[in-house]
């Protein structure tokens, strides 16, 4: 179950640097460029293909341009994902494990994570449809692990994100108590490896 949370979280940060493209992409870009930094609480509900709730969670979510992301699941089981602008750190306190990959590897692990980049060639692989206050984002590659992402706004606030995977699971995130990133919050994007944890450095593996 934690894998579902992790895949969903890796897909979240990444609505920040969408390039200008035709139609729905242009409209979504305007919305996203109004959000330079963001910190909020989130509540997450995961349902299966039969609409049965299989997990709930809550935590803290933060974004800052460029390519910085903080996702701290505080319940039911703690986990932490931090993107510091170059690397993505995934920490499981219960297992005492840390995985680290570079931004490009995170993109490969979760194709929707491509939203962190402003690369036009990359975004040509995705379709964006404007449905009023919400936007549907879907990969043209049907083998992608994430089949669709919906992001919703209330004027200039990002209020909701819904991720659907190929197994029929839906992760619904609702954001509350939103504020811009304060000066004392900037350290959220700096991950310090705890003592006595196992480190799976996938950056090194990718170079071999």
UniProtKB/Swiss-Prot annotation:
Name of the protein this chain belongs to: Outer-membrane lipoprotein carrier protein
Cellular compartment(s): Periplasm
GO annotation, cellular component aspect: outer membrane-bounded periplasmic space
Function: Participates in the translocation of lipoproteins from the inner membrane to the outer membrane. Only forms a complex with a lipoprotein if the residue after the N-terminal Cys is not an aspartate (The Asp acts as a targeting signal to indicate that the lipoprotein should stay in the inner membrane).
Upper taxonomic lineage: Bacteria, Pseudomonadati, Pseudomonadota, Gammaproteobacteria, Alteromonadales
HAMAP family: LolA
Keyword Protein transport on entry: yes
Alphabetical UniProt keywords: Chaperone, Periplasm, Protein transport, Signal, Transport
PANTHER family given in the database record: OUTER-MEMBRANE LIPOPROTEIN CARRIER PROTEIN (PTHR35869:SF1)
Matches recorded under Pfam families: LolA
GO biological process: lipoprotein localization to outer membrane; lipoprotein transport
SUPFAM superfamilies xrefs: Prokaryotic lipoproteins and lipoprotein localization factors (SSF89392)
Signal sequence residues: 1-22
Oligomer status and interactors: Monomer.
Family indicated by similarity: Belongs to the LolA family.
Source species of the chain: Shewanella pealeana (strain ATCC 700345 / ANG-SQ1)
Taxonomy, superkingdom: Bacteria
